[in-house]
């Protein structure tokens, strides 16, 4: 658009000072001049003449100063302000011009009108900016460099400044991306260096060239190349191959993969430490590669695109500057001309209206050029020219703004695309970092327990380490009772009596202290009671002779006096802690007296005399010394002429019993020679002679204590019983009966004590039964003639219907009974070492130790009960129908109760409990209590000895009135002692056998049996059961009566089956010595 509006010069040559505006004074209209090219826009000379003629002044004088309304009236409101801002009710809207803010007004413009700077100011500012510009940049960019001045409010200038700022943003982004690419490249080099720093010499590694998994522990041996084969040989081989039938290819079965690597750790990929080298190297290698990729992507894609965009933006800024001329407009001058013509038109119309109303004919005469029609025509043509200029300016604005909008959208989208690409690269780097390091560690070594490597290491070295995992409990140390070997419960290997005695031989004049052990076949004399000390120990040296009258004498025979333990053979626990090892020299007795050729010559309360053949195991000088004193017994090969009878036996036969057999058959002559030499030495070191030994009570004081006297009586009675038999088999049967009667008696005492007492006393020997049972009491003896030839092992078939309780008892019976305990004390038949306090306020019960054949593997359980609980629970019933406690025998001699839930046969439950339930006349309720699990309360029909499937494994006392026919379990119906052992007492309410454990019942009301009286004694904590007259059993033959009648009344103990308190507790001596809570299972 050209600047066609110019201000014409006045006659005096000056330019009009101020153009006329609508609403100006009348004199201002005279100074208005139109541009020279007004005709080119449709203007005529008549319009100019009419517009600027001097005779048109009368029209202009008729109109007011301004015809434009100040305020636009509201719709439906006739009140408005006039041109002077005063309210006038008589103003008509059609007589005034609308304001320029109204789109209907001829003065309204709907776009901004650009303002030009003065020529001198614009040139000076442009020159100043060009001088400060960088010669390397474009002129258009340098002009709009940021400075302290504001940008001119012009459309092109504003947009150029806008895109100049975008160029600066692109320049900063390009600089940042260059630095980011450089930093990624540097970090990639660092990651490669860190990858090379990961060095574990023996873990699985990544090969640098191929990135394959390799095991550094496996040495790489070079593969041998095949030798070249000549062509003739190849043809010959191919000919043979065609003739021979090709066998089928055999596919080798792949060996099972080893779970452990060659380094000793778990295999790679199992989440072990073996993965750490591959994980770290893989992480740094992948991260370095990704960072190199990011650097190349930034330099090759992001930065070039931003650089090209910046260049294109510079070109577009030049194009915008070229549009600067499109915004040069004279719309303001057109508005002024329109205002002049509009005022003339309004004045002519007003003049004619006023003349017609007043009737003045002079006023109606207007000049022809001031005809309202002609003035309106000129006004419409001017308005048309004004609208054309206005539309042209609008098109310029639309063109510029739409182009700028598209350009900025392109710039913004390019920046978005570059940032999105960069963000995707960084995101891939972060995901790679999380995947290759974090996830690998979290799913691998971080998710494993700390001991997984140790468990794998231990399991792969079974030859040098125990297969003990971290979650496994530590293995229990094996005890001697856990060892199983043939004949481990043979009665021939039992210790009958042990302790210190004073001995006097025929050649000596004084008594000598010695440690004696009475077994099934021999009476051995040892140096000391400590079998765990070496021969160089101070305790193995000779000690002074101990006589009953003088303890400070020196031992003349050279035997070891030892310490002064109790008469039962127990040692001081402080001394047992210093034992270091087992010395073979301490296990050989000084002398041994065979019971097969021995007889009890005399016995009193304080002494007894034995005659027989003695074997000496001392060195040769001892044998020579003894032979010099008794010339008639010097040669062991002579036949003894005296004492002919059952004791007559050649010394050679006696000597062979005690000679240990160390020889082994071998085909090598040297070994045979060596064995013969050893046999000759052993024969020379053993001497035999007929002796007569006198024994006395050993006591630390001048007078023996009652306990020592009592123990000495037991020695006398046991020796009497053992020397009365002619063969080892008879003596073995006697020991078996002794063990059985002792256990039944102890269990009965335990049951009685748990009912009527709250204290525990030491164990009473089974020999005392013969002393304490009165003739009037009911006794039951065993017939040894019927049982002399009984089988020592009864095979019980394991049928399918055998109940679980019987099977458990069979398995629990396979528990070894050691001959010596952990403290070095010898185990004595019929007695247990009781460690419970004497007051009986608390007791300890342990479950059986785990044995190779026992299904029960639980740890030891401890039950502590006070006296109050015992008293409170003693009034309850021992058992109820269906509740059968089980007994397990441990190596400590204790009993633990297996719950009755182990039984699967309900008939077996009821049958086992019937022996207890038959005592009561009415049904009682059962209250579970821990007291019911105590020893002595369980039925006697359970296995009481540890011999599996043997004689002592047969359930005893399997007889009851309520158990007949199908009520008996298959296990008990197969027992050969079921019918043989049944006897009936006077009351008729229960049946009893020789091996029956007396069951005690709680207090109840008096029933039909008039002999039973229930009452509460004064001061007693619980009710007790008393009898008016004793219960007896008649027609029972005494055991071993046919073997030796002279000793039957004194030697054989009798087992009582009386179930009252009087018969069990009213004893002549040692009434406080009751049976402990634990059974004698350790014998």
UniProtKB/Swiss-Prot annotation:
Alphabetized Pfam families for the sequence: BAR_4, PH_20
Claim: Cell cycle is one of the keywords in the record: yes
Annotated compartments: Cytoplasm
UniProt main location, coarse: cytoplasm
Region called Disordered, residue ranges: 1-46, 69-89, 534-582, 979-1083
Ranges annotated as biased composition (Polar residues): 13-31, 549-570, 983-992, 1043-1061, 1071-1083
Protein's recorded name: Regulator of the glycerol channel 1
Taxonomic path: Eukaryota, Fungi, Dikarya, Ascomycota, Saccharomycotina
């Amino acid at each position: 658009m050209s600047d066609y509006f110019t201000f014409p010069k006045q006659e005096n040559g000056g330019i009009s000072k101020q153009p006329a505006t609508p609403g100006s004074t009348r004199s201002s209209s005279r100074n208005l001049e139109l541009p020279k090219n007004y005709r080119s826009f449709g203007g005529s000379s008549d319009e100019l003449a009419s517009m600027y003629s001097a005779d048109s002044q009368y029209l202009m004088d008729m109109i007011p100063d301004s015809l434009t309304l100040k305020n636009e009236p509201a719709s439906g409101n006739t009140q408005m302000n006039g041109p002077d801002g005063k309210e006038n009710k008589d103003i008509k809207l059609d007589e005034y011009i609308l304001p320029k803010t109204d789109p209907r007004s001829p003065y309204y413009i709907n776009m901004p009108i650009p303002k030009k700077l003065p020529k001198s100011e614009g040139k000076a500012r442009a020159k100043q900016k060009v001088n400060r510009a960088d010669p390397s940049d474009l002129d258009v960019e340098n002009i709009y460099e940021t400075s302290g001045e504001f940008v001119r409010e012009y459309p092109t200038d504003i947009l150029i400044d806008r895109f100049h700022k975008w160029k600066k943003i692109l320049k900063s982004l390009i600089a940042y991306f260059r630095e980011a690419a450089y930093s990624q490249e540097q970090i990639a080099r660092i990651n490669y260096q860190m990858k090379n720093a990961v060095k574990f010499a023996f873990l699985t590694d990544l090969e640098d060239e191929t990135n394959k998994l390799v095991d550094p522990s496996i040495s790489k041996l070079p593969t041998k190349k095949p030798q070249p084969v000549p062509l003739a040989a190849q043809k010959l081989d191919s000919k043979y191959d065609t003739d021979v039938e090709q066998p089928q290819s055999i596919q080798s079965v792949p060996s099972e993969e080893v779970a452990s690597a060659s380094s000793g750790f778990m295999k790679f990929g199992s989440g072990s430490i073996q993965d750490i080298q591959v994980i770290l190297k893989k992480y740094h290698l992948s991260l370095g590669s990704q960072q190199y990729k990011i650097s190349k992507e930034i330099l090759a894609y992001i930065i070039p695109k931003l650089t090209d965009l910046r260049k294109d933006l510079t070109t577009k800024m030049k194009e915008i500057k070229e549009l600067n001329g499109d915004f040069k407009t004279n719309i303001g001058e057109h508005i002024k001309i329109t205002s002049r013509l509009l005022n003339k038109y309004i004045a002519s119309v007003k003049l004619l209206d006023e003349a017609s109303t007043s009737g003045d004919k002079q006023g109606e005469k207007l000049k022809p050029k001031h005809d309202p029609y002609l003035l309106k025509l000129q006004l419409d043509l001017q308005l048309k020219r004004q609208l054309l200029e206005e539309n042209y300016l609008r098109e310029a604005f639309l063109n510029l703004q739409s182009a700028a909008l598209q350009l900025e959208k392109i710039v913004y989208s390019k920046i978005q695309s570059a940032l999105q690409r960069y963000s995707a690269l960084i995101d891939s780097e972060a995901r790679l970092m999380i995947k290759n390091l974090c996830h690998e560690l979290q799913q691998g070594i971080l998710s494993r327990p700390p001991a997984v490597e140790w468990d794998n290491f231990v399991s792969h070295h079974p030859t040098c380490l125990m297969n003990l995992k971290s979650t496994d409990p530590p293995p229990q140390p094996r005890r001697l009772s856990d060892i199983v070997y043939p004949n481990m419960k043979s009665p021939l290997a039992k210790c009958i009596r042990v302790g210190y005695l004073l001995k006097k031989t025929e050649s000596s004049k004084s008594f000598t202290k010695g440690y004696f052990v009475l077994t099934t076949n021999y009476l051995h004399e040892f140096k000391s009671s400590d079998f765990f000390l070496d021969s160089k120990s101070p305790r193995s040296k000779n000690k002074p002779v101990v006589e009953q009258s003088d303890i400070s004498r020196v031992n003349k025979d050279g035997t070891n006096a030892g310490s002064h333990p109790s008469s039962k053979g127990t040692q001081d626990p402080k001394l047992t802690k210093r034992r270091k090892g087992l010395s073979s020299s301490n296990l050989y007795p000084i002398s041994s007296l065979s019971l097969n050729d021995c007889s009890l010559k005399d016995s009193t309360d304080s002494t007894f005399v034995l005659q027989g053949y003695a074997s000496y195991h001392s060195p040769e000088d001892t044998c020579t010394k003894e032979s010099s004193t008794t010339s008639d017994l010097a040669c062991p090969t002579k036949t003894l002429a005296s004492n002919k009878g059952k004791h007559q036996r050649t010394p050679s036969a006696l000597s062979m019993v005690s000679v240990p057999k160390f020889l082994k058959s071998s085909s090598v002559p040297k070994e045979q020679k060596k064995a013969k030499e050893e046999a000759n030495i052993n024969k020379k070191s053993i001497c035999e002679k007929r002796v007569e030994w006198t024994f006395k009570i050993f006591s630390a004081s001048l007078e023996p204590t009652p306990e020592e006297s009592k123990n000495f009586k037991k020695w006398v009675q046991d020796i009497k019983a053992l020397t009365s038999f002619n063969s080892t088999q008879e003596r073995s049967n006697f020991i078996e009966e002794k063990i059985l009667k002792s256990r039944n008696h102890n269990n009965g005492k335990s049951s009685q004590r748990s009912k009527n007492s709250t204290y525990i006393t030491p164990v009473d020997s089974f020999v005392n039964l013969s002393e304490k049972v009165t003739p009037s009491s009911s006794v039951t003896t065993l017939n040894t003639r019927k049982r002399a030839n009984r089988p020592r092992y009864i095979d019980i078939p394991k049928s399918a219907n055998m109940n679980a309780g019987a099977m458990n008892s069979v398995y629990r019976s396979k528990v070894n009974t050691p001959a010596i305990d952990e403290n070095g004390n010898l185990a004595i038949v019929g007695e247990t070492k009781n460690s419970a306090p004497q007051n009986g306020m608390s007791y300890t019960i342990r479950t059986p130790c785990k044995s190779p054949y026992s299904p029960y593997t639980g740890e030891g359980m401890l039950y502590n009960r006070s006296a109050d609980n015992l008293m409170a629970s003693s009034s309850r019933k021992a058992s109820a129908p269906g509740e059968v406690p089980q007994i397990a025998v441990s190596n400590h001699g204790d009993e633990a109760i297996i719950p009755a839930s182990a039984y699967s046969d309900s008939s077996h439950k009821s049958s086992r409990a019937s022996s207890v339930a038959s005592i009561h006349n009415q049904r009682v309720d059962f209250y579970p209590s821990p007291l019911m699990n105590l020893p002595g309360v369980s039925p006697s029909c359970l296995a009481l000895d540890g011999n599996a499937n043997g004689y002592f494994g047969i359930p005893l006392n399997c007889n009851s009135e309520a158990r007949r026919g199908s009520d008996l379990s298959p296990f008990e119906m197969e027992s050969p002692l079921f019918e043989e052992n049944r006897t009936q007492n006077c009351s008729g309410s229960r049946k009893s056998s020789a091996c029956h454990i007396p069951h005690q019942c709680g207090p109840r009301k008096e029933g039909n049996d008039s002999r039973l009286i229930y009452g509460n004694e004064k001061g007693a904590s619980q009710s007790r059961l008393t009898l008016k007259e004793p219960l007896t059993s008649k027609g029972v033959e005494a055991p071993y009566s046919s073997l030796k009648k002279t000793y039957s009344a004194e030697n054989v103990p009798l087992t009582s089956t009386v179930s009252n308190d009087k018969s069990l507790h009213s004893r002549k001596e040692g009434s406080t010595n009751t049976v402990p809570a634990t059974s004698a299972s350790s014998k």
